[in-house]
């Protein structure tokens, strides 16, 4: 499936139905009063998150979403039926902006979250509402109000707990394929990963976390080189970054600081996230390899996705960080105090 993380759509809520001009006509009531019913409300347009969706691909093919107008009022005080609502499913992590002002309308991060994005027009009132002692036979009714219409710009930031960051061929795709159910394309050449991949890592029974693998970053990514920069927003919501560096790197320390520099140029706040350095491909490492201390307080783990070396320790460390931040984000139960 093609990965699409931005799209623009046009939404138009339904117009309200017209109020009715009608007069009561019965055999023994030759001059009945006004009995025109109200028009129905136009259909609303809603956005709803769907955890099964991971891309905005659908919106490349369908760009207009128009709700049904309300039914016009009828005689005998009959109110028209409301127009049917339109519900648009989007992935969790979708940011919705007003296409004209670029103002953020919604940041949809919750599961099954719904937001009313365009309100249907109210139905017009029938002529029964306009009778007065001096005007007992009004011959007019209200038209229905127009439904809201707007252009929406949508941007997807994937919802993941752990973000994998590294140069091309650092072993990110191999790692996520080994410790999760994700099946990314893997090959021994740079830029095999062209789009982000998500994988669910099963830690223990009833415990799991989501890992995101983005295309490799190269030096100069902040100036537009390579593929990784355009996908860096997909790690902005992660709880921890795993910086992957291959054991056969010419200079592990230099590669680490280069990666941090590119992250800082893209979004300085990314450096505020906790991070872990993972030296990969230890199965092909030189026997005399010495892994330097890269930064105070930043742990360095050595792994091999091929032999399995260090994978349990890595999962333990990632789960400890992820679960700790989940607990920290939960509101305190004041009744326990």
From Swiss-Prot:
GO cellular component: cytoplasm
Cofactor requirements of the protein: Mg(2+)
Pfam families noted in UniProt: GTP1_OBG, MMR_HSR1
Single GO MF annotation: GTPase activity
Source species, domain of life: Bacteria
Positions bound to Mg(2+): 173, 193
Catalytic activity, EC: 3.6.5.-
Biological process annotations from GO: ribosome biogenesis
Domain Obg, residue spans: 1-159
SUPFAM superfamilies xrefs: Obg GTP-binding protein N-terminal domain (SSF82051), P-loop containing nucleoside triphosphate hydrolases (SSF52540)
Residues that bind GTP: 166-173, 191-195, 213-216, 280-283, 304-306
Quaternary structure note: Monomer.
Family affiliation: Belongs to the TRAFAC class OBG-HflX-like GTPase superfamily. OBG GTPase family.
Record function comment: An essential GTPase which binds GTP, GDP and possibly (p)ppGpp with moderate affinity, with high nucleotide exchange rates and a fairly low GTP hydrolysis rate. Plays a role in control of the cell cycle, stress response, ribosome biogenesis and in those bacteria that undergo differentiation, in morphogenesis control.
PANTHER family: DEVELOPMENTALLY REGULATED GTP-BINDING PROTEIN-RELATED, MITOCHONDRIAL RIBOSOME-ASSOCIATED GTPASE 2
Protein name: GTPase Obg
Species, as recorded: Pelodictyon phaeoclathratiforme (strain DSM 5477 / BU-1)
Gene name of the record: obg
